[in-house]
Amino acid sequence: LAAALTEEMGWNVVVSNMAGGAGAVAFEDVLSNPDDGYRFVFYHSGAAITQIMGMYESFNVLDDFKLAGMPVLDYSNAFVSNTANEKFSDVETMVAYMKANPGDVTFATETGSFTHLHVLAFQEAAGVEFHIVDAGTASQKTTELLGKRLDVIGTQAGLVRDYLDTKEFTCLGILADERLAGRPEIPTMKEQGYDIVFSKFFYLAAPNAADDAVITAMNAGL
Protein backbone atom coordinates (compact mmCIF):
# COMPACT_ATOMS: atom_id res chain seq x y z
CA LEU A 1 0.00 0.00 0.00
CA ALA A 2 2.80 2.42 0.90
CA ALA A 3 4.59 1.68 -2.36
CA ALA A 4 1.40 2.20 -4.36
CA LEU A 5 0.67 5.53 -2.68
CA THR A 6 4.23 6.66 -3.27
CA GLU A 7 4.02 5.75 -6.95
CA GLU A 8 0.52 7.02 -7.65
CA MET A 9 0.45 10.15 -5.49
CA GLY A 10 4.14 11.10 -5.38
CA TRP A 11 4.18 11.03 -1.59
CA ASN A 12 7.02 9.85 0.61
CA VAL A 13 5.18 7.19 2.60
CA VAL A 14 7.26 5.68 5.41
CA VAL A 15 6.17 2.48 7.15
CA SER A 16 6.96 2.00 10.83
CA ASN A 17 6.09 -1.44 12.19
CA MET A 18 4.89 -1.16 15.79
CA ALA A 19 3.93 -4.52 17.23
CA GLY A 20 2.29 -5.18 20.56
CA GLY A 21 -0.90 -4.92 22.52
CA ALA A 22 -3.17 -5.97 19.64
CA GLY A 23 -2.46 -2.64 17.97
CA ALA A 24 -2.31 -0.58 21.16
CA VAL A 25 1.32 0.46 20.65
CA ALA A 26 0.58 1.85 17.19
CA PHE A 27 -2.64 3.60 18.20
CA GLU A 28 -0.96 5.25 21.19
CA ASP A 29 1.98 6.37 19.05
CA VAL A 30 -0.29 8.08 16.55
CA LEU A 31 -2.27 9.78 19.31
CA SER A 32 0.87 11.04 21.05
CA ASN A 33 2.28 12.75 17.95
CA PRO A 34 1.25 16.05 16.33
CA ASP A 35 -2.32 16.05 15.04
CA ASP A 36 -1.41 17.40 11.61
CA GLY A 37 -2.83 14.34 9.88
CA TYR A 38 0.46 13.14 8.47
CA ARG A 39 0.70 10.14 10.77
CA PHE A 40 -1.80 7.33 10.27
CA VAL A 41 -2.37 3.99 11.90
CA PHE A 42 -2.98 1.07 9.53
CA TYR A 43 -4.95 -1.63 11.27
CA HIS A 44 -7.99 -3.84 10.87
CA SER A 45 -11.53 -4.15 12.14
CA GLY A 46 -10.44 -6.54 14.87
CA ALA A 47 -9.61 -3.41 16.87
CA ALA A 48 -13.31 -2.96 17.57
CA ILE A 49 -13.40 -6.43 19.16
CA THR A 50 -10.34 -5.63 21.25
CA GLN A 51 -11.97 -2.38 22.37
CA ILE A 52 -15.19 -4.14 23.38
CA MET A 53 -13.18 -6.71 25.36
CA GLY A 54 -11.63 -3.87 27.37
CA MET A 55 -8.05 -4.32 26.18
CA TYR A 56 -7.52 -0.66 25.19
CA GLU A 57 -7.37 1.49 28.31
CA SER A 58 -5.86 4.84 27.24
CA PHE A 59 -7.92 5.45 24.09
CA ASN A 60 -11.04 4.43 22.21
CA VAL A 61 -10.62 3.33 18.60
CA LEU A 62 -14.22 4.23 17.81
CA ASP A 63 -14.24 7.70 19.39
CA ASP A 64 -10.67 9.04 19.18
CA PHE A 65 -9.91 8.46 15.50
CA LYS A 66 -11.40 9.25 12.13
CA LEU A 67 -11.12 7.05 9.07
CA ALA A 68 -9.26 8.04 5.95
CA GLY A 69 -10.29 4.93 4.05
CA MET A 70 -10.52 1.16 3.93
CA PRO A 71 -8.26 -0.15 1.16
CA VAL A 72 -8.28 -3.88 1.95
CA LEU A 73 -10.98 -6.47 2.65
CA ASP A 74 -9.47 -9.75 3.84
CA TYR A 75 -11.05 -13.21 3.68
CA SER A 76 -7.94 -15.24 4.50
CA ASN A 77 -8.32 -15.72 8.27
CA ALA A 78 -7.17 -19.27 8.95
CA PHE A 79 -6.14 -21.95 11.41
CA VAL A 80 -2.63 -23.18 10.65
CA SER A 81 -0.59 -26.08 12.05
CA ASN A 82 2.94 -27.38 11.66
CA THR A 83 2.84 -30.21 9.12
CA ALA A 84 5.22 -32.23 11.32
CA ASN A 85 2.65 -32.21 14.12
CA GLU A 86 1.98 -35.81 15.21
CA LYS A 87 -1.36 -35.22 16.91
CA PHE A 88 -3.49 -34.60 13.82
CA SER A 89 -3.31 -33.84 10.11
CA ASP A 90 -6.55 -32.00 9.37
CA VAL A 91 -9.62 -30.56 11.07
CA GLU A 92 -11.40 -33.91 11.33
CA THR A 93 -8.50 -35.64 13.07
CA MET A 94 -7.83 -32.54 15.19
CA VAL A 95 -11.38 -32.48 16.55
CA ALA A 96 -11.28 -36.22 17.22
CA TYR A 97 -7.98 -35.86 19.06
CA MET A 98 -9.27 -32.91 21.08
CA LYS A 99 -12.39 -34.74 22.16
CA ALA A 100 -10.22 -37.60 23.38
CA ASN A 101 -7.65 -35.24 24.94
CA PRO A 102 -9.42 -32.06 26.18
CA GLY A 103 -7.09 -29.08 26.56
CA ASP A 104 -4.07 -30.87 25.10
CA VAL A 105 -3.96 -28.97 21.80
CA THR A 106 -2.46 -25.50 22.09
CA PHE A 107 -3.88 -22.61 20.08
CA ALA A 108 -1.88 -19.39 19.87
CA THR A 109 -3.61 -16.05 19.76
CA GLU A 110 -3.16 -12.56 21.18
CA THR A 111 -5.58 -11.95 24.03
CA GLY A 112 -8.44 -9.72 22.98
CA SER A 113 -7.58 -9.93 19.30
CA PHE A 114 -9.63 -11.03 16.29
CA THR A 115 -8.02 -14.49 16.35
CA HIS A 116 -9.09 -14.82 19.98
CA LEU A 117 -12.68 -14.46 18.81
CA HIS A 118 -12.03 -17.03 16.07
CA VAL A 119 -10.85 -19.73 18.47
CA LEU A 120 -13.72 -19.14 20.88
CA ALA A 121 -16.19 -19.49 18.00
CA PHE A 122 -14.57 -22.73 16.84
CA GLN A 123 -14.60 -24.21 20.33
CA GLU A 124 -18.32 -23.54 20.60
CA ALA A 125 -19.10 -24.89 17.12
CA ALA A 126 -17.01 -28.05 17.48
CA GLY A 127 -17.67 -28.74 21.14
CA VAL A 128 -13.97 -28.91 21.96
CA GLU A 129 -11.50 -27.07 24.15
CA PHE A 130 -8.09 -25.74 23.17
CA HIS A 131 -5.35 -24.79 25.57
CA ILE A 132 -5.32 -21.13 24.50
CA VAL A 133 -1.94 -19.41 24.69
CA ASP A 134 -1.18 -15.71 24.34
CA ALA A 135 1.82 -15.91 22.02
CA GLY A 136 1.96 -12.30 20.88
CA THR A 137 2.03 -10.93 17.37
CA ALA A 138 1.53 -12.78 14.08
CA SER A 139 5.27 -13.07 13.51
CA GLN A 140 5.86 -14.33 17.04
CA LYS A 141 3.15 -16.96 16.65
CA THR A 142 4.65 -18.06 13.35
CA THR A 143 8.10 -18.45 14.92
CA GLU A 144 6.70 -20.54 17.76
CA LEU A 145 4.76 -22.75 15.35
CA LEU A 146 7.84 -23.25 13.20
CA GLY A 147 9.69 -24.43 16.29
CA LYS A 148 6.84 -26.85 17.06
CA ARG A 149 6.23 -25.22 20.42
CA LEU A 150 2.57 -24.71 19.49
CA ASP A 151 -0.01 -26.87 17.75
CA VAL A 152 -2.25 -24.35 15.97
CA ILE A 153 -2.14 -20.61 15.35
CA GLY A 154 -4.77 -18.18 14.16
CA THR A 155 -3.38 -16.02 11.37
CA GLN A 156 -3.90 -14.95 7.77
CA ALA A 157 -2.97 -17.45 5.09
CA GLY A 158 -0.99 -14.82 3.23
CA LEU A 159 1.27 -14.18 6.20
CA VAL A 160 2.52 -17.78 6.17
CA ARG A 161 2.39 -18.40 2.41
CA ASP A 162 6.10 -19.27 2.20
CA TYR A 163 5.69 -22.03 4.79
CA LEU A 164 2.58 -23.29 3.04
CA ASP A 165 4.54 -23.43 -0.22
CA THR A 166 7.33 -25.47 1.38
CA LYS A 167 4.76 -27.73 3.09
CA GLU A 168 6.22 -26.91 6.51
CA PHE A 169 2.82 -25.56 7.53
CA THR A 170 -0.65 -26.92 6.85
CA CYS A 171 -3.64 -24.62 6.57
CA LEU A 172 -6.41 -26.52 8.34
CA GLY A 173 -9.16 -24.23 7.11
CA ILE A 174 -10.13 -20.76 5.96
CA LEU A 175 -12.80 -18.90 7.92
CA ALA A 176 -14.67 -17.84 4.79
CA ASP A 177 -17.75 -18.70 2.75
CA GLU A 178 -15.68 -19.80 -0.23
CA ARG A 179 -12.17 -21.05 -0.93
CA LEU A 180 -9.55 -18.44 -1.76
CA ALA A 181 -8.96 -17.93 -5.48
CA GLY A 182 -5.21 -17.85 -4.87
CA ARG A 183 -5.27 -20.94 -2.61
CA PRO A 184 -8.01 -23.19 -3.98
CA GLU A 185 -6.45 -26.25 -2.32
CA ILE A 186 -7.30 -24.96 1.17
CA PRO A 187 -10.78 -25.98 2.40
CA THR A 188 -13.04 -23.66 4.32
CA MET A 189 -14.11 -24.47 7.85
CA LYS A 190 -17.67 -24.17 6.60
CA GLU A 191 -17.34 -27.02 4.11
CA GLN A 192 -15.78 -29.13 6.87
CA GLY A 193 -18.89 -28.75 8.99
CA TYR A 194 -18.11 -25.67 11.07
CA ASP A 195 -20.01 -22.57 9.96
CA ILE A 196 -17.42 -20.06 11.12
CA VAL A 197 -17.01 -17.12 8.78
CA PHE A 198 -14.96 -14.03 9.61
CA SER A 199 -13.75 -11.33 7.25
CA LYS A 200 -12.03 -8.13 8.21
CA PHE A 201 -11.20 -4.84 6.61
CA PHE A 202 -7.97 -2.90 6.96
CA TYR A 203 -8.12 0.85 7.31
CA LEU A 204 -6.08 4.00 7.74
CA ALA A 205 -7.04 6.32 10.58
CA ALA A 206 -5.73 9.50 12.18
CA PRO A 207 -6.55 11.34 15.42
CA ASN A 208 -9.78 13.35 15.40
CA ALA A 209 -7.80 16.60 15.48
CA ALA A 210 -6.01 15.82 12.21
CA ASP A 211 -6.38 18.30 9.35
CA ASP A 212 -9.44 17.37 7.30
CA ALA A 213 -7.69 18.38 4.08
CA VAL A 214 -5.01 15.75 4.69
CA ILE A 215 -7.63 13.12 5.47
CA THR A 216 -9.46 13.97 2.24
CA ALA A 217 -6.24 13.73 0.23
CA MET A 218 -5.43 10.33 1.71
CA ASN A 219 -8.94 9.11 0.96
CA ALA A 220 -8.53 10.21 -2.66
CA GLY A 221 -5.20 8.40 -2.84
CA LEU A 222 -6.72 5.19 -1.57
Describe the predicted segments one by one.
Residues G46-S58, H116-A125, D151-E185:
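A ligand-binding cleft/hinge motif common to bilobed small-molecule-binding domains
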Residues V160-L222:
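C-terminal lobe and pocket-closing loops
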Residues M18-A26, L73, T111, V133-T143, ...:
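Short helix-initiation/N-cap motifs at beta->coil->alpha
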